[in-house]
Amino acid sequence: MATIHFTKVHGSQNDFFLVDEEENLITEWSDEQRADFAIKLCDRKHSLGGADGILYVTKSSEVGPIGQMRVVNSDGSIASMCGNGLRTVARYLLEKHALTEAKVETMKAILDVKKATSLGFDIPTYQVEISPVKFAAETLPMHVGVEKLFNQVIPELDTELAFSAVSVPNPHLITFVDQSVLDSDKQEKLASYLNSENPYFPDGVNVSFVKRLSDDAIYVRTFERGVGFTNACGTAMSACSLIKKMLDNDTFETPLNVYNDGGRVQVTAKEDAAGEISLQLIGNATFVSKGSVRYENDIVTELTNEATAEQALYQALVKEVKEFLKTTE
């Protein structure tokens, strides 16, 4: 029997249970144990309301980073990266170590994180690096007959939509659409197919439909691999921002406002002298509640759950975003 303490968090209402492995003395858990606990705790029928996944935080395996983030989706699968989750982990670790910036180890990269100026309503806001960025088909992996997919129609997927694909490092398939396509069931059908057994994306893929709002703003809706539709996906919003900049031959260093069903973030693309691209994602890191559960005989039982006042602040931003999005339909 184990008592597990958690912090319920969200980035753009992409919600998670953040679990500190050291404080909970579960650093020796196997991947199977982490997956089973995630499946049980993240069930939307659970008394705690479930979540999109669990963010396991532990010591870094490298010298330098102040911690390591492991992401397990609600279905027990492992996510190589999660931008929205990383913002909340950044806040947790920076506050724990009394720092304003540092590095955090993720599954495939060590990334810069820092506290940022609030995007509004005094909401705790953090900036995280999204990288590495790769376009090669083998990095996704992707089998659609091209080595790099950029703004191209793939008839096997859709006869009209032009797709781009990029890994950041988790895989993303992106297309820009109008409101009528957003209102249709195209995205759900395509994403469901590509996240079941298929010859094109054998490991599945995050599928985003993007609508242009202005020269410096887009709306993104994402069907996440291992989860389904979520309020927002941080790596997807970052990847979509990059594709928009590339399609428009726009300046990389200029921030882009990205709207989603869960709120709003900002993304800036950067390219170094060697041609390597990285992305900076800025958005909320909201702590919704703190609590504990009992995990015994494969059953997760709620013990405590105390809400913070932070969600009310975030809802003010969501209201503003929804009012703005209505004007764009």
Curated annotation (Swiss-Prot):
Substrate binds at residues 14, 73, 83-84, 170, 206, 224-225, 234-235. InterPro entries: DAP_epimerase_AS, DAP_epimerase_DapF. It catalyses: (2S,6S)-2,6-diaminopimelate = meso-2,6-diaminopimelate. Disulfide bonds: none annotated. It holds the Pfam family DAP_epimerase. Its main location: cytoplasm. Keywords: Amino-acid biosynthesis, Cytoplasm, Isomerase, Lysine biosynthesis. One of its GO terms (cellular component) is cytosol. It is found in: Cytoplasm. The record marks 172, 224 as: Could be important to modulate the pK values of the two catalytic cysteine residues. Pathway: Amino-acid biosynthesis; L-lysine biosynthesis via DAP pathway; DL-2,6-diaminopimelate from LL-2,6-diaminopimelate: step 1/1. HAMAP family: DAP_epimerase. NCBIfam families: DapF. Homodimer. Catalyzes the stereoinversion of LL-2,6-diaminopimelate (L,L-DAP) to meso-diaminopimelate (meso-DAP), a precursor of L-lysine and an essential component of the bacterial peptidoglycan. Belongs to the diaminopimelate epimerase family. This is Diaminopimelate epimerase. The lineage of its organism: Bacteria, Bacillati, Bacillota, Bacilli, Bacillales. The gene is dapF.
